[in-house]
From Swiss-Prot:
This is UvrABC system protein C. It comes from Petrotoga mobilis (strain DSM 10674 / SJ95). Keywords: Cytoplasm, DNA damage, DNA excision, DNA repair, Excision nuclease, SOS response. Gene3D superfamilies: 5' to 3' exonuclease, C-terminal subdomain, GIY-YIG endonuclease, UVR domain, UvrC, RNAse H endonuclease domain. GO terms for cellular component: cytoplasm; excinuclease repair complex. Belongs to the UvrC family. InterPro entries: GIY-YIG_endonuc, GIY-YIG_endonuc_sf, GIY-YIG_UvrC_Cho, RuvA_2-like, UVR_dom, UVR_dom_sf, UvrABC_protein_C, UvrC. The gene is uvrC. Residues 200-235 form the UVR domain.
Amino acid sequence: MIDRSILNNIPKKPGVYIFKNNKGDPIYIGKAKNLKNRVSSYFNKKNYIGNEKTYEMLEKATNLDYIITSNENQAFILEANLIYIHKPKYNIMLKDTRVYPYILVTDEQFPKIKYIRTKKEEKGKFYGPYSDVKFVKDVIEVLQSVYKIRSCDRDLGRKSKPCFLYHLGRCYGPCYKDVDETVYQESVEKVKKVLSGDIEEVKNYLQKAMMDYAKIKNYEKAAQMRDTLFKLENLFEEVAVEYKNGKNLDIIMYEPPVYLVLIVRKGYLISKLSFTMEGTLEDFLYQYYIVRKNEPPSLISTLYNEEISPEILDFLKEKGLKRIEKIGKSSKIYEMAYTNLQEEIKRQKDLSFALKQAKEILSLKKEPKIIEGIDISHLQGLYTVASLVRFENGKPKKEGYRKYRLDDIKAPDDFESIRTVIKRRYQKHELPDLLFIDGGKGQVNSAVEALKEIGYSLKDVDVVGIAKEDERIVFPGDIPDLHLPLDHPVLRLLIYVRDETHRFAIGFNRSLRSKRFEKTKLDDIYGIGPKRKKELIKHFGGIQKLLEASIEEISKVVKSEKIAKRIKESLGEK
């Protein structure tokens, strides 16, 4: 614990205080009108009697830092920014029940549109979060087909070969040629309009374009416009909920620790998000809109009238919020929101029950809140790879997934592969609560052997696996296998982890094989040397895109119609 003498140097000014552990990592961040008074309160045990979390934090804190600000408002904003960056263990934190993607329109001379998994410190306008990755990718595809905004990371200062999207008519190609900046920016503004929920203009544009092409008997183009229009309407029709005369609002339903957010823009429900957090509505608003920097709508509807602090309300109003109101229980949107909230609560309870059961039934040292699963994949000993997936509170944490190439292992040897991955992973990273190995007794024992080689034992981590033939849960050493009914929540959880490790490993293995296979295919074509091969791969990205390209498109890259025809013939098009 920190020595009380540290209080002598703390000023009686507004600011932010930061408790740090012995590694120098922030473990709790707070703000104060008077830093000295606030920090002093932590040294009076009466102030946190019964608060185990605060007591534990103070036990682990070995240092205290602080930042003086000009006023309370600055301290409020700085606290939120520091929590966003450091995610301290003992602050009340909002936890996603799954990964929610964003769409980013960058702030550049020629902005690009891109799909990102997590909000980063990047210049531009963020839209989201969205509940459906496929929805996000489909929306970007539609917007590019209409407005031709780039999505590549190419250096526009150096003109290069046009990308495949340019040839498809889905990009203006500023990396390839000079583009009118005014025209491009007009397209960007229209994209932003659609992402803000206003789809009427783009619908009207597509309808008119379809009719115009039909009038001049360009039926191929007319069909393209029709298909794009149908896709757009289907994307938004599936989630359409008319509400509040087309206004923008967020509907927040909650029964702590579960919070549900329905995002409605221009009368369309575009996203349903769920989170877990121990805290009040005020805590949620602070975390969701201020710490995470999600843009507030003009209206927030909630189930209860709770008092919100003036500093949070003032901040949200500066960002565009007009008011927070209580939602009417007789409205259709309430019924839908409440039903979704109850479903999420049930799902969370099922996961919580499975984790508690896992501790008891598998005789684990603690509840497996963090599970890491490992699987090996190869093709008859070639292209050996490993996957590592991470589950937190029973849910996949995809930013924690890792891939490993095992090029040194030339023969089919799962045991040596597992030993290699275990050592590479846990020499640098902390152990999970439960280590899951996709395999039987031999694979599990190999993992334990590798852990011993780097200084760990079964006192440090539990290790289990699942035998593929009959879904038996296997343990290290002489511990007998465990048979559970297929519908048992613990077995279902482990099978979920197993299937995810397998899916991730197989996907990586196929990707590796595909890349090497594609290069081999091009190597076999007469007239394709290293330079042309590099240009083709850079331009088209892969064999599938090359197959879809016309001879004319390939000719532009290889500078020879004869070689372009030979490529098409060699790849299967006679």
